[in-house]
Amino acid sequence: LVLAGKVTVDGKKVTELSTDVDIENSRVTVNGKIVHPINKHIYLKMNKPKGYVCTTSDDKGRKTVLDLLPEKYRDKRIFPVGRLDYDTEGLLILTTDGDLAQKLSHPSHEIAKTYVAKVEGTVPEPDLAKLRKGVMIDGVMTKKCKVKVLEKDEHFSRIEVTISEGRNRQVRKMFESVEKEVVFLKRVSIGEIRLGGVPRGTVRELRPDETEYLSLI
């Protein structure tokens, strides 16, 4: 949005991502709409490793994603937005903003989430077509989605899948429906928020353009 010239501060177009803004006293607009400050809350993106649960506590004694937070965030009421499976890696948003978390999790928004799956063997084109069109999971058809083969050999395939739903273990179950096992799964984006170069097991605060995007959903 910033690079596209759609953001103004006090009436002046901003095109540099590193622009400093006095969020309390400046008038910020995106596509002509005033954006109210949301930086009073904390907004983080994490590269979640497998072996952690996306809850604030776990009655089975497993490690939670909050255990990965740096000390400076430990006394904040931070919680994950949505979930990644225990054995799935990748992008997870964490925040103190309950309203935003509820908005992002609501099915009506249908925010695209992109995953990269490592699958045993190759997936024939007819099966890829089935996945794109929708398959039956737990008695309910999945919505149409994007499926792209990134690379493949006789042993494994790397396949990018973009879905707009958030059903439990959806990507894994989609491949199970065509008799393929996912051996590794990583989420790489949520809408326009991308994992980027965040190292595994660490967090980074969202940039102003990323929080602006979330505020407009």
Give names to the regions the model predicted.
Residues 1-217:
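Basic, flexible Lys/Arg- and Gly-enriched helix-loop patches that mediate nucleic-acid binding at interfaces
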